Every structure is written in structure tokens, then in C-alpha cells.
A protein has these predicted regions:
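Alpha-helical scaffold segments that flank or form the walls of functional sites
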Residues: 39-43, 48, 56-111, 137-156
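Divalent metal-coordination and catalytic microenvironments
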Residues: 44, 86, 186, 244, ...
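Histidine/acidic-residue-rich catalytic or RNA/ligand-binding cores of hydrolases
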Residues: 51-55, 98, 124, 203-209, ...
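Active-site gating/metal-coordination segments in enzymes
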Residues: 103-106, 111-113, 117-187, 243, ...
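Catalytic pocket-lining loop regions of alpha/beta-barrel enzymes
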Residues: 183, 187-262
Length: 343
């Protein structure tokens, strides 16, 4: 009888493990976490950014203690608003520092998510020479290895892919390569792709590359979508399954309110993310001018409520949508958005 009970217990434990593995997960700087839709997210922010460019950037000169002392008060402010997840969208060669993010996460208790990928904005100012020479397949192997083994010989692993393109009549060949490499990385890892894009003119060719590579638009976040003037582009992007990120709340409010009202009227709030694109510590400045990460809570949400937004709609923007957007899940083209829902 004891032997039978032990076997039953082992079967129950095995089933529990399998169920746990199938539930959506996120990768933050401290490890993988099982997700639900009850946590508050800031889905596009920055802790440190260094615009000096790939030729001159010197991460080894950054004083972690000084940076942590400067940035911690802004994280302390988040406790009043119960922020659980903080997505640091700073890419490699623009200020990504995995160990710094890990230290801040441990100190503040906020779960920070970092990225792999490369940033082509600014005529490839932040693209290292090796990336210009490699194929998309070779680039993707580097990014996949960061997800498997950690960033720069650390235990910190990325929770999404961050790329960036310049908007033009046609994508620069390097930027086409970045998008394809991101798509290939997604197919191997399930990491969501967040692309600095801006106007919709730069979105459609990226989604076409994803489609050609066999990746669903549901794996893709249209970053800085507030730059688009034609709101009908949001209808098209939402219909395709793309995530639409209005992430400049730290810099401007009225445009974000107008666009969120458009999304509400047209029934597409379930594809929208909101964030500040705020911060950040700049190693090139002696005196820092850091923007807080709280404007959503102190200014935007009261305005949205005054315009008739319900608690459920606000929960959608700050909890449900980002949980789904950053869930690690391979989403091949075509993708049934109803196929997998968070519990």
C-alpha cells in the first residue's frame, strides 16, 4: 500500500511539473517566473542609456554604486503603485548592463527584464562591426546563446529581443538583417520582439519579414507607435495581431490619451501597451536629469478614468496585455490569438 501511495504521489508531482512548464513564463534578470495577469507592468523604460556610440562606449567605466544611488529613489516611488515588472528596453551597445540591472532588482525587489538584440537606429551608430559582417542566421545564434547561457558570461538572461530600425521608404539592409535575426531567435526561444519603429511606414516591412520567416505578428511589439499620425494604422496592426506600444507617457500626455480613446472606441485596447520611455542615468552627464516612472499612475490614469475608462480596461493595459505580450511562447505564422490564454 505504501508503495502504491508513493507511486501516486510521484505521478501527481510529475503532472504538476508538466503543468507548470506549460504555463506562460517570463525571463527576468533573476530567472524564469510563471506569469499571471495580476501584476502591474511598466513595459518600456530605461535605467541607463549612453548615446556615445559603439566606437566609444566604455561600460567598464560605469560606477555601479553611484548609478544605483542615483536611480534607487525612482524605484522606491514605484512601491506605492505596486509595480512588479519593469522592462528595461536599453539595447546592447547603448547602455545595457546585465549586472547593474541584477543589482537594482535585488536591492529594490522590482523584477527587471533585459534584452538581447541590436539597435540600428541612427544610421547604425550602435551596430558593432562584427554584426555588419555576419548573416542574420549567425547573428541569431549569438542572441540565442545569450538566452541559453547568459549575457557576457553572467547568469543574467534576456527576456525579449530588442531591435531598432530607421524609418525610410525601404528598410536598410542591416535593419532587414536585424528583423530576420530577431525572427529566427524567436523561433528558437519564444522571446517576444520589441522593435524601435515609430511611424507605421517602418512597421509593415518588418511584419512582412516576420511572415516570410514563419513568425506571427503576435510575437512583435510596435515600439513608439504614438509617433504614427494616422490612427487607422492601429486598426490594421491590431487586426494582424501586432502589439501596439504607446510608450512616451513620460514626455507627453495628451496624444497618448487621444490614441487610447481611439483604441477604446474601436475595440482594440486588447492589443495596446503603455509605458513612459522614462529615466535615465546618462554616464556622459555630470548632473543627471532623470524622469520619474510614475506619470502613468499620477496623471494618465486619472485622465483615462475621467474619460470613462473602467477598472477592467486599465487592468488590460497595465496587467493583462503586457503579461501576454512578454510571455515566452513560440508564435508561428499564422497564429491563433485565442489558442493560448493566461490563467
Amino acid at each position: 500500500m505504501v508503495k502504491i501511495d508513493c507511486i501516486i504521489l510521484l505521478l501527481i508531482m510529475a503532472c504538476g511539473c508538466n503543468l507548470s512548464e506549460k504555463r506562460p513564463q517570463i525571463q527576468d534578470v533573476q530567472g524564469k517566473q510563471i506569469l499571471n495577469s495580476d501584476n502591474i507592468w511598466l513595459s518600456h523604460e530605461h535605467i541607463l542609456v549612453d548615446f556615445i556610440g559603439v566606437a566609444n562606449i566604455q561600460p567598464e567605466t560605469w560606477n555601479h554604486d553611484s548609478i544605483i544611488k542615483e536611480i534607487t529613489p525612482y524605484f522606491e516611488e514605484l512601491k506605492a503603485f505596486n509595480v512588479k515588472y519593469f522592462v528595461d528596453a536599453t539595447p546592447n551597445y547603448l547602455g545595457r548592463d546585465a549586472l547593474l540591472l541584477e543589482k537594482i532588482a535585488i536591492k529594490t525587489g522590482v523584477r527587471i527584464i533585459t534584452n538581447t538584440g541590436l539597435y540600428g537606429v541612427g544610421n547604425n551608430k550602435y551596430i558593432p562591426q562584427y554584426a555588419l559582417d555576419l548573416t542574420a542566421e549567425e547573428l541569431s545564434e549569438i542572441w540565442i546563446n545569450e538566452y541559453k547561457y547568459g549575457i557576457h558570461k553572467t547568469s543574467v538572461k534576456p527576456g525579449f529581443v530588442k531591435i531598432g530600425i530607421d524609418v525610410a521608404d525601404s528598410l536598410h539592409p542591416m535593419h532587414q538583417k536585424l528583423v530576420k535575426a530577431a525572427a529566427l531567435t524567436h523561433l528558437k526561444t519564444g522571446l517576444t520582439i520589441a522593435s524601435h519603429t515609430g511611424k507605421a511606414k517602418g512597421l509593415w516591412p518588418q511584419l512582412e519579414i516576420l511572415k516570410e520567416t514563419g513568425v506571427s505578428p503576435a510575437s512583435f511589439i510596435w515600439v513608439h507607435a504614438q509617433a504614427e499620425d494616422n490612427n487607422d494604422s492601429y486598426l490594421k496592426a491590431a487586426e494582424m495581431g501586432c502589439w501596439i506600444s504607446l510608450d512616451g507617457v513620460g514626455w507627453e500626455l495628451e496624444k497618448h490619451i487621444e490614441k487610447l480613446l481611439f483604441a477604446k472606441r474601436n475595440g482594440i485596447l486588447d492589443r495596446f501597451l503603455i509605458s513612459h520611455d522614462a529615466g535615465w542615468y546618462d554616464p556622459q552627464k555630470e548632473i543627471q536629469t532623470i524622469k520619474p516612472f510614475t506619470t502613468i499612475f499620477t496623471q494618465l490614469l486619472p485622465e483615462l478614468k475621467s474619460h470613462g475608462f473602467t477598472d477592467d480596461e486599465i487592468k488590460l493595459l497595465l496587467r493583462v496585455n503586457p503579461s501576454k505580450a512578454f510571455a515566452i511562447e513560440i508564435r508561428k505564422y499564422p497564429f491563433d490569438k485565442r489558442a493560448k490564454q493566461l490563467e
